[in-house]
UniProtKB/Swiss-Prot annotation:
Required for swarming motility and for maximal sigma-D activity. It comes from the Bacteria. This is Swarming motility protein SwrB. Residues 88-105 have a biased composition (Basic and acidic residues). Residues 63-105 are annotated as: Disordered. GO terms for biological process: bacterial-type flagellum-dependent swarming motility. The gene is swrB.
Length: 167
């Protein structure tokens, strides 16, 4: 009987020793992962700090350029005297938009052109789906022709039909 208890005791000790070893390896893996995450966090913080410093320097340069151009324009405005103040008060927003620097006007027109292009593409996609549906194509056939998802076309047609019924 005592041999059986000794055997059971050794087996339990072996199982517990095995469990301790497994838990220790898992703990080591977790610590290694934590160390890597801290290192990545430090690298990210350093990168962001460098980016912020660079951004701050650029902002300071921009402010200096703006201040120097403003001081030059102030000198010019002092020379012109009252004429400038009277014409400035009479300006409307349309005239101010016309007096924008060329590079800003170029950016604005580029943004407007891209918005129109995106809007026309969206409208043309919707119009094409509606046109194909009115021609009698099924949702799966429209999806194949438009290279889009069948569910997307079905939902679009369902929302369109509800919108037509509501209005």
């Amino acid at each position: 009987m005592s041999t059986l208890l000794w055997l059971l005791s050794f087996m339990l000790h072996g199982v517990l020793l095995y469990a301790v070893i497994i838990l220790y390896t898992r703990l080591a893996a977790v610590k290694e992962t934590e160390k890597q995450q801290k290192q990545i966090l430090e690298e990210t913080e350093n990168t962001l700090a460098a980016f912020l410093l660079e951004l701050k320097e650029e902002n300071e340069k921009l402010i200096e350029n703006k201040a120097s151009s403003a001081s030059q324009s102030d000198e010019e405005s002092q020379k012109s005297g009252l004429q400038t103040s009277e014409t400035y008060q009479e300006r409307d927003p349309v005239q101010e938009a016309e007096n924008l620097p060329e590079h800003i006007e170029g950016l604005i027109t580029e943004v407007d052109r891209r918005e129109e292009l995106v809007n026309s593409e969206v409208q043309s996609f919707e119009d094409q789906v509606i046109e194909l549906y009115e021609q009698g194509y099924s949702a799966s056939q429209i999806a194949q022709k438009m290279k889009s998802g069948k569910t997307e076309i079905e939902l679009f047609l369902k929302f369109r039909s509800k919108g037509v019924k509501d209005s």
